[in-house]
Amino acid sequence: MVDVVVLVDDLFFQAKIVETARLTGITLAICGTGDAFIATIDRESPKLAIVDLNSRGGALNALERLRASGNQTPLIGYLSHVQTELAESAKAAGCNDVMPRSKFTANLASILSGAKS
């Protein structure tokens, strides 16, 4: 079982998340598409899911489909601080928390640690 499932296609952020997870003892599953993200959440039942809302893997659609299926895994999304419309769309799609990349990066270790088994 993994602790956290992440939808991200930005290699810089992927590397940052993977390294922080390693340092905090969190097991991760990294997904590049919305379909893989949903399938992994359904299979692994993680404590947390993280979404790069700028992912080309269909982030908003994946959030909507996940919530429509009844899945209540806590979801955190991150994006550029100027993308207020995207932030509102993510919240409407079922994202529990949406934050700017800077806040996500600054708090990544504590975010991941909160999902420890």
Predicted regions and their residues:
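Conserved acidic segment of CheY-like receiver
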Residues: 2-11
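Short hydrophobic/Thr-rich beta-strand motif most characteristic of the beta2 strand and flanking loop
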Residues: 26-33
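Acidic, metal-coordinating helix/loop segments flanking the phosphotransfer/catalytic sites
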Residues: 33-48
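Conserved phosphotransfer microenvironments
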Residues: 51-66
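Conserved phosphotransfer cores of two-component systems
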Residues: 67-72, 93
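A short, hydrophobic beta-strand element within the central beta-sheet of small alpha/beta folds
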Residues: 73-82
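Alpha4 helix (beta4-alpha4-beta5 surface) of REC/receiver domains from two-component response regulators
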Residues: 82-97
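Output/docking surface of receiver
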Residues: 94-106
